[in-house]
Structure formats: C-alpha cells, structure tokens
C-alpha cells in the first residue's frame, strides 16, 4: 500500500480522492495553481504544493512540475483523477522513469485507446 499519494487534479475529483486516501490511512498531497490556493482540495490535503500560475497548461498540465512536486514530497504515487493527464501515455512513462507509481492504466493501454479512437474517427 502507498504511504502518500499526490493528486494531480483539482476540484471535486481531488476532494473525493483526498477523502478516500484519508479513509485508507494514506497521506494526501494536493497540487494547486495560484488561482486555486483557497480551494477545498488544498485545504483538505495533508500537504500542498503550488505548481504555477492559473492556466492549466502552466500548472495541472505541466508534467515536469507535477513530477517535481511528487519527488519533493516523497510521494509514492500520483493519482491523476480524470481529464488533465489521466490519459497521457507520456506522463505515465515519465512517472515510471522517476520511480513514481501511476494510479491508472499503463502507457500501453492508453496508447491503444488512442489508436482505437483514431480508427473510429477515420471510418
């Protein structure tokens, strides 16, 4: 079991993951943009890390900042929630390269989902 999980998301999904972590005795680490500093998920988490300015591309979609936050807080795993990086195979590979577990499908599964989506759109 993990000791700590970094939640790479915001809002209600992050709150639900934080509460699940608490119920399981796992420490939660919230990431947040400067715009979200007063959000509920930030308040509820055991630890919190600012990952940049407001636009998602500069914060919640910035893979390097999220990996850095996970490493700096000794997170055992990253939970992406949904959206943002949850279906990004490159992010899954980056987690693996940095010794951080990714809670979600493998990069290969995500790659195959993308290929199936491309097949359907080309029909």
Regions found by a protein language model. Name each.
Residues 1-123:
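N-terminal beta-alpha lobe that positions the nucleotide/phosphoryl donor
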């Amino acid at each position: 079991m993990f000791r700590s999980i970094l939640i790479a998301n915001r809002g209600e999904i992050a709150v639900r993951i934080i509460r699940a972590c608490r119920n399981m005795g796992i420490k939660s680490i919230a990431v947040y943009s400067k715009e979200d500093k007063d959000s509920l998920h930030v308040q509820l988490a055991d630890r919190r890390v600012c990952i940049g300015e407001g636009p998602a591309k500069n914060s919640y979609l910035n893979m390097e900042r999220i990996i850095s936050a996970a490493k700096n807080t000794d997170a055992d795993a990253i939970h992406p929630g949904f959206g943002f990086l949850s279906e990004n195979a490159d992010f899954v590979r980056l987690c693996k390269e940095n010794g951080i577990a990714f809670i979600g499908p493998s990069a290969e599964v995500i790659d195959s989902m993308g290929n199936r989506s491309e097949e359907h759109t080309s029909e």
